[in-house]
Amino acid sequence: MPFTGRSQLLAPLIAFFTVSETPVEDLRDLEEDIDQEVGDVLDEGQRFLAEELFASDDLVDAIQEEEGKVLTVYRDITGLPTVGAGHLVRPEDGLRVGDRITEAQMREFLKGDLKQAEDGVRRIAKATPLSQNEFDALVDLVYNVGPGNVLPSKSPKLNEALARGDYAGVARELSYSKARDGRRAGGLVNRSERRRRMFERGEYGDPREG
């Protein structure tokens, strides 16, 4: 069964105590205690195969903070139609610059883009185990630059480091400071630093606020 994070570990215990008719307030206290213990385990850097991991809520929050939540289709710095949390508009979306989407549509786009990024990480990580924060940092990278740009042909050093299990080497390859048109972008520089801290330290906050 794929590892889906805290909820998967909590579910059997909560179900047991629910069947035993434990009072609701006690269940809430129990869930908080267990969640803290589980969080401590995951935060210590326990590693899993990438196929067992999924983007965490902390990463989703970080992505939305970096990308923004824009409900009107606009052109990004390279001129491509974009909407929501950095979703690149595709022909099948049926949207043009100036069109508006709903919050629900934004969430659906984000969900689909995250899945694509997760799959992109699984393709390059293969059998190399990753901690939750390492996986999240790589998902952010793929989400930001696109799955094609992290393949061996485009990012050979990143793939070589992953194949060797060289985590320090992977961290060094997380920086992408140029937009699709080759221009250096300050936002990408800052995001790369955030991504590196996420990978190395499990810190998800914006370093610009420190």
What residue spans do the PLM features occupy?
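Residues that flank catalytic or metal-binding motifs in active/ligand-binding sites
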Residues: L59, I77-G79, E134
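Flexible, active-site-adjacent loop/turn segments at secondary-structure boundaries
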Residues: T72, P81, G86, T128, ...
